[in-house]
C-alpha cells in the first residue's frame, strides 16, 4: 500500500465513522430508519381539496395548516414546484391555485391572482387541457373547474369501464388504478349518460367498488391507498362527489391526519422506510459493521416487512417487499434491495426468506428479460391502457414498463443471494435487455430517477455483481461515466448539465467500484472526494429533487442520498484497500461461484 493510499484510507475511515454515527443516531427503536420524503405543494393541495369536500368542519385544523403551508411556500414568480424552494411546475402551480381558490377565495385572493398569472405563463387553460404539457391534466382541469377558474370544456371522463378490463391490462395501470376506479364512479354519477353509457356504468360499478374495498382490506385500519396521501385524496374526492362509501371516505380522512408532516403539508407518498432501511443497512455492511447489534436489528426489521400474501391488484405473488408499512405495494426495487441486505447479513437462498424473495423476482421478470416496478409485462399484454384516462397513449411517461434501475436491483439480488449462478439463462436474458436499451454512447435511461446517470451506474453495479464487469455493456457504461463526470468530480445530468448530485455521484461510484476500476485513477478518487466534501455539518448529505413518483411528479428522499453515498464511500475504501479488486465477503459472498471477470455474454 502506498503512502497516498494510506492517507486516502485515513480520510475515508474518519468520514465513514462520522457518517455511520450520525445515521445510528437517527435509527428508530425498532431498528428501521424513517426515510423522510419531501413535502409536496401538489400533494398538499390535493389533500386539502379532499378534506374540504368530505368534511370541512372535522378537518378544519388540518386544512388551516395546509393552507398556511401553501401561502408561505409560493415562489417569487407566483408558482409552486414539486417541492418547496424549487422551480415552479404547471402541476404544482395549478393544483395549489385550485385549492386556494376553492377553500379560501377571499383570504388568498392576492396569492391566487399571482398563481394564476404563473399558470398563464405556462400556457393557461390550453396547457392545462394538454396532457403533453400538464401530465396531471385529468386532475388539474377538474379541480380548476370546481374552483371556478376554468370551464368544463374538454373535461376528460375517467371511464368506469376500466373496472371491466381483463386483469393483465387492468394491472398495468398499477397505482393509478385506485384513482381510476374512484373517479370512474364519480364520472358515472355526475356526467350525462345515454342508454349505452348507463348500462356500462351499472355493469362496472360493483367491480369498481369491490376493487377499492379489497385494497382497504389489504391496507388495514392505518394504511392509505397505495400508501400515498395524494392517491388517497383522489379516492376520497371521487367517492365523496359520487355519494358512495362514506366508510372508505372516513378511512382516507383518518389517513390524512396520520400522515401530515410537521410543516403542515403532505408528501406524494408516505415515507420510504423500507427503502431507507435497505439502503442504510447495506451501507453499514459494506463499512464492515454487519455484526453490530444495531445492524442486526435492522436486518430483523427488514425480514419482518416481507409480504406473505398474494397481491392480486398487480398479480404479484407472496414474498415481496413494499416501500413502507403497513401497505406499500410489493415491487421489484424494494424486494431486490431487501434480498441484498439479508444476503449481506450472510444468508443465501437456503434461507427461506431469501429464497422466497429471490423467487418473487424471478416470477416477476418480464418476457424480454427486464423487470418493471409492480407488474410483470408479458408478450400478450403490451397495450398501454393509460390512453383511456388521458385521451392518448403516454408510454414514455407511465411507470408500468421496464426500468433499468429496477432490473439492476433484481439482477444484483439474484446474483448475490446465490439464486442465479453466473451464466444462468435468466441473467443472460437480463443482459440482453440491458444491451438492447443501452444508447450508442453507453448511457442507459430509467423510469424512476431523472437523467441517465442513475440507470447507467446501477446497471454497471449489477453486471459486476454477477461477474460481467468485463462485458461490452459494462465497458460502455464505464466509458459513459468517464466522459460525463462533471468538472467538480461529481456526476449528475438529472438537474441539468454539470449539476452534480449526491444520488447520481453515489450511483456512478457504486458501479465503478463494483466493476473494479483502478482506485488510483483520478475518476473514482475525485468522485469519492466529492462525496466526502459535500456532507453537511451533521456529516450527512442533502437529497436532490430527482426521484420520479408518478406522471412526472418529483420528490426528494433523504436516505436515498445517505444510503447510496454511504455504500459508495465504503466500497471505494474497500477498493483502495484491495488495490482495485472487489473480492470481499460482502461484494462476492462465499456461496457464489467466482466468475471470470473478463467473461462476456
Question: For each predicted feature, which ranges?
Answer:
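Preference for long, amphipathic alpha-helical scaffolds in soluble/luminal domains
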Residues: 1-601
Amino acid at each position: 500500500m502506498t503512502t497516498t493510499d494510506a492517507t486516502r484510507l485515513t480520510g475515508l475511515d474518519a468520514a465513514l465513522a462520522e457518517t455511520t454515527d450520525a445515521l445510528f443516531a437517527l435509527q428508530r427503536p425498532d431498528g428501521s430508519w424513517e426515510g423522510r420524503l419531501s413535502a409536496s405543494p401538489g400533494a398538499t393541495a390535493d389533500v386539502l381539496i379532499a378534506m374540504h369536500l368530505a368534511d370541512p368542519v372535522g378537518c378544519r385544523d388540518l386544512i388551516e395548516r395546509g393552507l398556511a403551508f401553501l401561502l408561505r411556500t409560493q415562489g417569487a414568480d407566483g408558482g409552486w414546484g414539486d417541492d418547496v424552494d424549487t422551480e415552479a411546475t404547471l402541476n404544482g402551480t395549478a393544483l395549489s391555485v385550485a385549492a386556494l381558490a376553492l377553500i379560501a377565495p377571499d383570504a388568498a385572493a392576492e396569492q391566487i391572482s399571482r398563481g394564476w398569472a404563473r399558470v398563464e405563463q405556462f400556457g393557461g387553460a390550453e396547457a392545462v387541457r394538454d396532457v403533453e404539457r400538464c401530465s396531471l391534466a385529468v386532475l388539474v382541469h377538474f379541480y380548476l373547474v370546481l374552483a371556478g377558474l376554468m370551464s368544463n370544456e374538454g373535461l376528460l371522463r375517467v371511464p368506469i369501464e376500466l373496472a371491466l378490463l381483463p386483469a393483465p391490462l387492468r394491472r398495468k395501470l398499477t397505482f393509478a388504478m385506485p384513482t381510476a376506479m374512484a373517479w370512474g364512479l364519480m364520472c358515472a354519477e355526475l356526467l350525462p349518460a345515454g342508454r349505452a353509457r348507463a348500462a356500462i356504468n351499472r355493469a362496472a360499478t360493483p367491480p369498481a367498488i369491490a376493487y377499492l374495498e379489497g385494497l382497504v382490506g389489504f391496507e388495514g385500519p392505518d394504511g392509505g391507498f397505495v400508501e400515498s396521501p395524494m392517491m388517497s385524496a383522489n379516492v376520497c374526492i371521487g367517492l365523496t362527489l359520487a355519494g358512495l362509501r362514506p366508510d372508505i371516505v372516513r378511512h382516507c380522512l383518518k389517513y390524512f391526519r396520520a400522515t401530515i408532516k410537521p410543516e403542515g403539508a403532505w408528501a406524494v407518498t408516505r415515507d420510504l422506510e423500507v427503502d431507507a432501511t435497505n439502503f442504510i443497512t447495506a451501507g453499514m455492511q459494506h463499512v464492515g459493521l454487519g455484526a453490530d447489534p444495531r445492524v442486526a436489528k435492522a436486518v430483523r426489521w427488514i425480514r419482518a416487512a416481507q409480504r406473505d400474501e398474494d397481491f392480486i391488484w398487480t398479480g404479484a405473488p407472496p414474498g415481496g417487499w413494499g416501500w413502507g408499512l403497513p401497505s406499500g405495494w410489493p415491487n421489484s426495487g424494494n424486494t431486490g434491495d431487501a434480498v441484498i441486505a439479508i444476503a449481506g447479513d450472510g444468508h443465501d437462498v437456503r434461507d427461506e426468506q431469501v429464497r422466497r424473495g429471490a423467487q418473487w423476482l424471478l416470477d416477476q421478470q418480464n418476457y424480454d428479460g427486464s423487470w418493471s416496478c409492480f407488474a410483470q409485462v408479458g408478450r400478450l399484454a403490451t397495450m398501454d391502457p393509460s390512453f383511456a384516462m388521458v385521451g392518448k397513449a403516454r408510454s414514455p411517461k407511465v411507470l408500468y414498463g421496464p426500468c433499468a434501475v429496477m432490473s439492476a436491483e433484481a439482477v444484483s439480488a439474484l446474483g448475490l443471494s446465490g439464486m442465479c449462478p453466473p451464466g444462468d439463462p435468466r441473467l443472460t436474458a437480463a443482459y440482453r435487455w440491458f444491451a438492447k436499451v443501452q444508447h450508442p454512447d453507453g448511457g442507459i435511461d430509467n423510469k424512476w430517477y431523472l437523467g441517465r446517470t442513475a440507470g447507467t451506474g446501477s446497471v454497471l453495479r449489477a453486471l459486476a455483481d454477477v461477474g460481467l464487469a468485463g462485458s461490452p455493456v459494462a465497458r460502455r457504461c464505464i466509458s459513459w461515466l468517464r466522459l460525463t463526470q462533471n468538472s467538480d468530480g461529481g456526476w449528475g445530468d438529472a438537474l441539468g448539465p454539470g449539476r452534480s448530485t449526491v444520488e447520481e455521484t453515489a450511483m456512478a461510484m457504486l458501479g465503478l467500484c463494483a466493476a473494479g476500476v483502478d482506485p488510483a485513477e483520478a475518476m473514482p478518487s475525485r468522485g469519492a472526494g466529492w462525496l466526502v466534501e459535500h456532507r453537511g455539518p451533521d456529516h450527512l448529505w442533502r437529497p436532490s429533487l430527482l426521484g420520479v413518483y408518478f406522471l412526472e411528479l418529483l420528490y426528494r428522499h433523504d436516505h436515498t442520498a445517505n444510503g447510496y453515498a454511504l455504500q459508495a464511500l465504503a466500497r471505494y475504501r474497500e477498493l483502495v484497500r484491495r488495490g482495485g479488486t472487489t473480492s470481499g465477503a460482502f461484494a462476492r459472498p462465499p456461496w457464489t461461484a467466482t466468475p471470470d471477470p473478463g467473461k462476456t455474454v
